[in-house]
UniProtKB/Swiss-Prot annotation:
It comes from the Bacteria. GO terms for biological process: CTP biosynthetic process; GTP biosynthetic process; UTP biosynthetic process. The keyword RNA-binding does not apply. This is Nucleoside diphosphate kinase. ATP binds at K11, F59, R87, T93, R104, N114. Homotetramer. Keywords: ATP-binding, Cytoplasm, Kinase, Magnesium, Metal-binding, Nucleotide metabolism, Nucleotide-binding, Phosphoprotein, Transferase. InterPro entries: NDK-like_dom, NDK-like_dom_sf, Nucleoside_diP_kinase, Nucleoside_diP_kinase_AS. The gene is ndk. One of its GO terms (cellular component) is cytoplasm. The lineage of its organism: Bacteria, Pseudomonadati, Pseudomonadota, Alphaproteobacteria, Rickettsiales. Belongs to the NDK family. It is found in: Cytoplasm.
Amino acid sequence: MAIERTLSILKPDAVKNNITGNINSYIEQSGLKITAQKMMLLTKKQAELFYEIHKDRPFFGELVEFMTSGSVVVQVLVGENAVSKYRQIMGATDPKQADKGTIRGDFADDISENRVHGSDSLENARKEIAFFFAECELV
């Protein structure tokens, strides 16, 4: 099994609703370790660059507005198959389709405010981690 890094973002709705500790518990109970973490307020430019892959999608403007509406917590998670493991504990993108026992299944109600972001591939995890963290911040 491969030890990997993945990026997690606890979105503004998670911070505003004070459930970051609950989400961190799900992460740690899965066997993943939080090795870097910081709270920040994304600028419009940062959100546009981070979600650039979605720039031609109809929800892009709403996504950028939401991601800049309040503080987020960005994290680096480390563990065996971290990318797929975190995607599994996040649950389906649409909380209505997410299983109970997943972050979205237990804490989210709406697809546009679904509490968390996680890298979808090892390659994207590397890019996303580098977007938010300098190499010297990584353990």
